[in-house]
Design a protein with these regions (language model features):
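Bacterial N-terminal signal peptides that target proteins for export
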Residues: 1-11
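A signal for specific C-terminal beta-sheet/loop modules enriched in small/flexible residues
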Residues: 1, 64, 89, 121-124
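A periodicity- and composition-biased signal for non-globular, repetitive helical segments
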Residues: 8-10, 112, 121
Length: 132
């Protein structure tokens, strides 16, 4: 009887430890993701009035937060400071809870509609960087 109790206790402890380990691994895969977008604006007025408000609203609606905005003109943006190499004219960095959430936003109807407008007034270069 005592052996059965010991085996049952060990099995229960193993399941508990395994569950904690799986939860920990899952948490590590859901790191924040930063979407770095370098922008060369060709029509600042139209970009600021037609594109920027739409894309900013779509980021917010999809759970992203814009944490950095730099470059010439628009929405209180500060200048991009050259450290090494030639800096882009404008940079926007939103952060997302996960790569999946960022990708869902990128393929959303709101973002696609905004991007059609943005492509008329700017050229974009974007890449995602995992957070720690």
């Amino acid at each position: 009887m005592k052996t059965r109790y010991t085996i049952a206790s060990a099995l229960l402890a193993g399941v508990g430890i395994g569950a904690v380990a799986v939860q920990s691994l899952h948490a590590q895969t859901n790191r924040p993701v930063y979407l770095v977008t370098e922008i060369d604006v060709t029509d600042p007025g139209a970009y600021a009035t037609e594109y920027a408000p739409k894309v900013q609203a779509s980021v917010k609606a999809a759970g992203g937060r814009i944490i950095a905005l730099g470059g010439t003109g628009g929405a209180g943006a500060k200048f991009v400071t050259q450290v090494e190499g030639q800096p882009p004219k404008r940079v926007v960095i939103p952060v997302w809870d996960s790569l999946q959430k960022m990708q869902a936003w990128r393929s959303s109807d709101d973002n696609r509609e905004a991007r059609k407008i943005g492509d008329q007034y700017a050229k974009f270069r974007s890449y995602a960087v995992d957070g720690l």
